[in-house]
Amino acid sequence: MAYILLVEDDNDLRAMLKSSLEKNRYTVIEASNGREALQKFKPLLTDLVITDLLMPEQDGIGLIMEIKKIKPEVKVIAISGGGKAGPSNYLSIAETLGADAVFAKPFSLTSFIEKVSSIIG
């Protein structure tokens, strides 16, 4: 069973994603911001980090950089609504930092789960 760290500050979206991932037999650990995610990140267990990019305390860009220092091979999916700048700028930065996939909000849950499956099985 794959272990996923899900980082999203929107409680409703995080709950929906967690439920969908668990229905697909993934183990999900939740965090509401990058700082909390770093505390919960388990390098030996984590197969995938799914992170929003715009969050309080520590954003997803900083989180990706920190996690890639700890475990460069960890897979990452970045999601963003982009705030005032729109999602494309933030998502392209995430790709440059090593995100394996990016999704602009709102996105298709079916496409999202398919991408998770293709990345970690």
Task: Describe the predicted segments one by one.
Residues 52:
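Active-site residues of response regulator receiver
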Residues 61-73:
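Short amphipathic alpha-helix used as the core "switch/output" element in two-component signaling
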Residues 8:
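Conserved acidic carboxylate
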Residues 11-29:
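Two-component/phosphorelay signaling modules centered on CheY-like receiver
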Residues 62, 83-103, 110, 114:
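Alpha4 helix (beta4-alpha4-beta5 surface) of REC/receiver domains from two-component response regulators
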Residues 55:
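Receiver (REC) domain active-site loop signature in two-component systems and cognate sites
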Residues 33-36, 59-62:
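Acidic catalytic/metal-coordinating carboxylates
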Residues 79-81:
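Hydrophobic/aromatic residues positioned on beta-strands within the core alpha/beta folds
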